[in-house]
Curated annotation (Swiss-Prot):
The keyword Repressor appears for this protein: no
InterPro entries: BlueCu_1_BS, Cupredoxin, Mavicyanin, Phytocyanin-like, Phytocyanin_dom
Glycosylation (residues): N58
Protein name (record): Mavicyanin
Pfam families associated with the record: Cu_bind_like (PF02298)
Residues where Cu cation binds: H44, C85, H90, Q95
Disulfide bonds: C57-C91
Molecular function, one GO term: metal ion binding
Length: 108
């Protein structure tokens, strides 16, 4: 199984412009893999939301929230998963990512 470090060395941030959609499209996600969000938890968090909330940057009722600054999130089932930063304005700056998980497990 693969650990996918969101944003690679940049991490989960708004300090530099980062294309999280491009990062996601350049990775293959499989059941059993995990996401690692690295960030300063004074300034950011990670919320799992649905598609509508993702599109509108709505962080009012997330399915899950993570605040450790080094969050490992297992990808337990296939489908599309949506994550954003719940700090006001950050999602609008592009701090959000859509993860498409393939049904098959990775061959690692």
């Amino acid at each position: 199984a693969t650990v996918h470090k969101v944003g690679d060395s940049t991490g989960w941030t708004t300090l530099v412009p980062y294309d999280y959609a491009k990062w996601a499209s350049s990775n293959k996600f499989h059941v059993g893999d995990s996401l690692l969000f690295n960030y300063n938890n004074k300034f950011h968090n990670v919320l799992q939301v649905d598609q509508e909330q993702f599109k509108s940057c709505n962080s009012s009722s997330p399915a899950a929230s993570y605040t450790s600054g080094a969050d490992s999130i297992p990808l337990k089932r296939p489908g599309t998963f949506y994550f954003l930063c719940g700090i006001p304005g950050h999602c609008q700056l592009g701090q959000k990512v859509e993860i498409k998980v393939d049904p098959g497990s990775s061959s690692a």
